[in-house]
A protein has these predicted regions:
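Short, solvent-exposed loop/turn segments at secondary-structure junctions
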Residues: 2-3, 34-38, 45-47, 110, ...
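Short strand-connecting beta-turns/loops that link adjacent beta-strands
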Residues: 36, 165-167, 221
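ATP/Mg2+ or Mg2+-diphosphate-binding catalytic cores
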Residues: 227-247
Length: 247
């Protein structure tokens, strides 16, 4: 059921946009049919996570990202520019390019959710926002990404990876132009199986910029602050602890 204006339109456009990176890209659940407020997808057979499937997925994800996007925060093709959604939280999708990744991440992926934090937590996050916006933390996309932004899933926590007998199939995207490292970092927020093997195979297929392992926490902050906005609780302490490392 569609709980948000345009949520199904956004999901359908995102699935089709990600699937357009096939056959080299990652597996994406098929859209069988959809209408106003509803979406039909096939029932996926369940397999077991394996090292081999993880490595295959890592290589394929590199090619999905390499399919690219026009700019950071770009909406998927076919979606009239509007806010998207990550879970039940709104997701700003700017229609114009932003000058740097740090400015984009600060303005559109951290700041919109800071009103959920207490004053002390907001103070730390404000320092991080300033540092991000300065460009001091900017870094390159992986080698295969030659567009201004990667074509990202946008919500790649463990539950959105379906391990089928034919390999990993992605569901429930918050698809957008983003930094590839954010998808890779999100794998570890809730412990996706073989996350290290996924990242290692990805790095072999499309070498990541130096220091990428140190930046995993930085790229998890968007997903974590969204969880602060939605749920509060222990997510705040985790978010602030990571942010302190970067201010």
């Amino acid at each position: 059921t569609d709980h948000h204006k345009n949520a199904i339109d956004y999901e359908v456009a995102g699935l089709m946009w990600l699937a357009a990176a096939r056959p080299d890209g990652a597996g994406i659940v098929e859209v069988l049919d959809h209408g106003k407020g509803w979406l039909t997808e096939p029932e996926l057979s369940t397999g077991h996570p394996t090292r081999e499937a993880a490595e295959d997925f890592g290589r394929r994800l590199a090619h999905t990202h390499a399919a690219g996007a026009s700019h950071l925060g770009a909406a998927p093709d076919g979606f009239v520019p509007d806010d998207g959604y990550i879970g039940r939280a709104p997701l700003p999708l700017p229609s114009e390019p932003i000058s740097s990744w740090g400015e984009f991440y600060a303005q559109y992926r951290i700041e919109p959710y800071m009103d959920s934090l207490d004053a002390d937590a907001r103070a730390i996050m404000s320092k991080l926002v300033d540092r991000l916006a300065s460009g001091a933390l900017d870094h390159d996309e992986p080698a295969l990404v030659t567009c201004p932004a990667a074509r990202t899933h946008g919500d790649m926590w463990a539950g959105n990876l379906m391990w089928t007998p034919d390999g990993v199939v992605l569901i429930d995207p918050a698809a957008q132009g983003g930094h590839a490292e954010e998808d890779l970092a999100a794998l570890s927020v809730f412990g996706a199986p073989f996350a290290e093997r996924i990242r290692a195979a990805y790095n072999e297929e499309s070498p990541l910029a130096d220091g990428w392992e140190d930046r995993i926490g930085l790229h998890q902050l968007h997903m974590l602050i969204v969880h602060c906005w939605l749920f509060g609780g222990g997510y705040v302490d985790q978010t602030v602890a990571i942010a302190r490392r970067w201010v």
